[in-house]
Amino acid sequence: AHNVKHVPHSMGIGVNSHDMNRQQGMRIPMIHRLVLLCLLLILGGANSAAGKLNIVFILIDDMGWTDLGCYGSRYYETPNVDRLARQGMQFSDAYAASCVCSPTRASILTGKYPGRLHITHAIPIQGAERIKEPLPLLEAIYKKNLPLEEVTIAETLKDAGYVSASMGKWHVCWDREFYPEHQGFDLNVGGNNMGNPGNYFFPYNGKWRMTPKHPFTRWNTLPDGENGEYLTDRLTDEAVAFIEKNKDRPFFLYLSHYAVHTPLQAKKKIIAKYEEKPATEHHDNPTYAAMIESVDKSVGRVVKRLEKLGLTEKTVIIFTSDNGGHGKITSHYPLRGNKGNFYEGGIRVPLIVKWPGVVKPESKCKVPVISTDFYPTILAMAGLAQRPKQHVDGASIVPLLKQDENIRRDALYWHYPNYIGAGHPGGARPCSVIRRGDWKLIESFEDNRLELYNLKDDLGEQEDLASSMPEKTQELHRMLKQWRAEAKVQMPKRNPDYDPK
């Protein structure tokens, strides 16, 4: 065969015209089949991508339960979030997994309680060092980085073909090796190890130290920008650009605004509007109101871009907060407490879910849910298999969203073996909390005191029923202790140098 010469067909030697036409006749359908196969693969992939829901998760920092028009505020103006509530489901009893940021954020990303993760305080704060008085307990050591071994919701979605972006606050680590790009996100814009931006206007430089005894940590949230640029707007610019770029593939947008965390900084024009507006009984800070309005405009821009691109019907929007609002800045009335403690004002948060074609517009839900639930819920929304060994403390709230059944869960739990330290009114001291039905029990580790409240009758937690209802108190206390043992939480220890006198 290697010695055969090539002979031109014109010489009449070799394949005759009939044979050649026959072979070409066989060859053409083969080409057609290959082209058809390629088209089917391409279209199949496109249809598969087209069939997947996009997920937009908007997390606001330190937004209180009543900081929105749809949650009762007559001072703060939030027309875009209010519209979102009218188009979806609004939850009255939604909870953050902690009264401070890092633990709640870790719970959202992993589906696990902060106590189980051992991420129980705002990284890297050691609250006891901020308190000048002697303390009866040595606060528990907690992890300063979300372990890479945890399979985050971003990693699970990535395995399913999603492209994902973390925009804004991260704050579940101290070391760079644990930033969003190492936890499943394809894009990280402005996420680092700090809990606030230092500045809301470019340049976004910041410096912080835990106490005067500690050296300053300095950072720059976003090195590039233009003078006068406002961080909430910049993150929104990045978010809509991400949506535009990935409009033809399924995406997960984790839009985690630094607002409305301190420092209080907002656009002068919006501040001026609220300075002219009569304050209400509970809300009266013009700068904070202006920050909330900028967040609301951000939501409006994201929704508008989805509408413009024809993505509204295939995009879920989840809107919530990581804990209650700052007690020196906003009011949580009728709730007791604020960010930094475990009364309702510190942990009850706004939650709105818009899921076109599934969630009935203007629907309400009073069933207690918590931030560990987002992981399994998003998987269920996306039609993906649950990962119960990962999101062990979460429950899918899809049955609630569809209004076809309740979720099976005995209770919600919180664990905080630390001290908040200075800065927040009524700052938490080491404690654990359980809510079961309408009942809520708080156990304080310093003096073993138990507080019992019926939230249905006493939303403001003004009447402690522990002494008058010992059986209910002990029932919940037993459950709380059993959960702590199962979750293997870390506990504070007695301070051997403490003298109660």
Task: Give the positions of each predicted feature.
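A long, amphipathic alpha-helix that forms part
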Residues: 236-246, 272-314
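C-terminal cap/loop subdomain of S1 sulfatases and analogous C-terminal strand-loop tails that border
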Residues: 186-187, 191-197, 325-330, 337-344, ...
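Long, internal low-complexity/basic segments
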Residues: 11, 15-26, 49-53, 60, ...
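A short beta-strand-to-alpha-helix junction
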Residues: 73-78, 95-100, 126, 140-151, ...
